[in-house]
Amino acid sequence: MDSNTVSSFQVDCFLWHVRKQVVDQELGDAPFLDRLRRDQKSLRGRGSTLGLNIEAATRVGKQIVERILKEESDEALKMTMASAPASRYLTDMTIEELSRDWFMLMPKQKVEGPLCIRIDQAIMDKNIMLKANFSVIFDRLETLILLRAFTEEGAIVGEISPLPSLPGHTIEDVKNAIGVLIGGLEWNDNTVRVSKTLQRFAWRSSNENGRHPLTPKQKQ
């Protein structure tokens, strides 16, 4: 077994432990908690593959990190932080569109993972645009703040929002929720398009209608 593979796993285990302490002290936000959960699953899988005990690996990882920090200069740390990527907040919607109250004539609500989807089933034969405000890191959607569906007249007819009781979501969660929202709106012969910002950072690829093709699950 390659020694670098082992040491990498040990350091990752210790860093996960540190991040868990941050969450336990209620200092982490939703994206932080989401990454923590995903990395926990990854570490369990890696530990099983390598045949290594996570608790023992965490202790060794702590020793490795402590040794590195002891040798690290403050100047080197500043340079590392300066070069680290920062998340960006992108806005399709104005403050008014983001905060506007709306109601549904024929309400339908569905929970898809940690996201809540709301659709007004009374809307028919409309051209609809999906807009969203969200943060981006590494050119991918990091955290969805709110997504809303607007008619050409500016009426809100659908929405996707994070559930406060289930913090943290992945880009796949967002894609699935968008698919459900689009499928629900198209059921009533509405034409749905996705904003260029969402296409670029959340969908990666789109068809000629400006949106990602739906999977069979999303069409339901």
Curated annotation (Swiss-Prot):
GO cellular component terms listed in the entry, alphabetical order: host cell cytoplasm; host cell nucleus
Post-translational modification (record): Upon interferon induction, ISGylated via host HERC5; this results in the impairment of NS1 interaction with RNA targets due to its inability to form homodimers and to interact with host EIF2AK2/PKR.
SUPFAM superfamilies xrefs: Ns1 effector domain-like, S15/NS1 RNA-binding domain
Entry keywords, A to Z: Eukaryotic host gene expression shutoff by virus, Host cytoplasm, Host gene expression shutoff by virus, Host mRNA suppression by virus, Host nucleus, Host-virus interaction, Inhibition of host innate immune response by virus, Inhibition of host interferon signaling pathway by virus, Inhibition of host PKR by virus, Inhibition of host pre-mRNA processing by virus, Inhibition of host RIG-I by virus, Inhibition of host RLR pathway by virus, Interferon antiviral system evasion, RNA-binding, Ubl conjugation, Viral immunoevasion
Single GO term (MF): protein serine/threonine kinase inhibitor activity
InterPro entries (UniProt xref): NS1, NS1A, NS1A_effect_dom-like_sf, uS15_NS1_RNA-bd_sf
Annotated stretches, region: CPSF4-binding: 180-215
Motif (Nuclear localization signal): 34-38
Pfam families assigned: Flu_NS1
Keyword Ubl conjugation: yes
Chief subcellular location: host cell
Localization annotation: Host nucleus; Host cytoplasm
Start and end residues of each stretch annotated as RNA-binding and homodimerization: 1-73
Domain of life: Viruses
GO biological process: symbiont-mediated suppression of host cytoplasmic pattern recognition receptor signaling pathway via inhibition of RIG-I activity; symbiont-mediated suppression of host gene expression; symbiont-mediated suppression of host mRNA processing; symbiont-mediated suppression of host PKR/eIFalpha signaling; symbiont-mediated suppression of host type I interferon-mediated signaling pathway
Record flagged with keyword Oxidoreductase: no
Placement of sequence motif Nuclear export signal: 137-146
Subunit structure: Homodimer. Interacts with host TRIM25 (via coiled coil); this interaction specifically inhibits TRIM25 multimerization and TRIM25-mediated RIGI CARD ubiquitination. Interacts with human EIF2AK2/PKR, CPSF4, IVNS1ABP and PABPN1.
Job of this protein: Inhibits post-transcriptional processing of cellular pre-mRNA, by binding and inhibiting two cellular proteins that are required for the 3'-end processing of cellular pre-mRNAs: the 30 kDa cleavage and polyadenylation specificity factor/CPSF4 and the poly(A)-binding protein 2/PABPN1. In turn, unprocessed 3' end pre-mRNAs accumulate in the host nucleus and are no longer exported to the cytoplasm. Cellular protein synthesis is thereby shut off very early after virus infection.
Similarity comment: family membership: Belongs to the influenza A viruses NS1 family.
Domain commentary: The dsRNA-binding region is required for suppression of RNA silencing.
Protein name as catalogued: Non-structural protein 1
Organism: Influenza A virus (strain A/Tokyo/3/1967 H2N2)
Gene giving rise to this polypeptide: NS
